[in-house]
Amino acid sequence: MLKEFKEFIARGNVMDLAVGVIVGAAFTAIVNSLVTNIINPLLGIFVGSIDFSNLVFTVGSAHFRYGAFINSVINFLIIAFVVFLLIKLINKLIAKPAEEPEEAVPSQEEKYLQEIVELLKQDKIEH
């Protein structure tokens, strides 16, 4: 069983997934900091509140923390946009350059037609 586990862990795609999860977690921390420390204050200038996470409305004893939801939506949009850009970049790097079409070799019939056209041009010039 230990041997099977080692083989499973040693597979490339499992290691790639592990690295992706770690990098994703670190990236999430960066995005959270960006939203909390830069974007929220900028939006707060226009809305009149600097910290969205404190935005709450209460109905009876229920507290609706819509500010935290706004922060989560902003985080999601930033992460989704960055993932979109990364996928676009990866696809661009993976995509094979478009092969230029080879110049078509004229068929025998096309060669004869070209010769006839040239002869007609010469005949026209001589008359």
From Swiss-Prot:
PROSITE patterns, per the entry: MSCL
Signal peptide (from-to): none
Membrane-traversing stretches: 19-39, 42-62, 67-87
Transit peptide as UniProt keyword: no
Keyword Transport found: yes
UniProt cross-references to InterPro entries, sorted A to Z: Mechanosensitive_channel_CS, MS_channel, MSC/AndL, MscL_channel
Alphabetized UniProt keyword annotations: Cell membrane, Ion channel, Ion transport, Membrane, Transmembrane, Transmembrane helix, Transport
Described function: Channel that opens in response to stretch forces in the membrane lipid bilayer. May participate in the regulation of osmotic pressure changes within the cell.
PANTHER family: LARGE-CONDUCTANCE MECHANOSENSITIVE CHANNEL, MECHANOSENSITIVE CHANNEL MSCL
Assembly: Homopentamer.
Record's protein name: Large-conductance mechanosensitive channel
Upper lineage: Bacteria, Bacillati, Bacillota, Bacilli, Lactobacillales
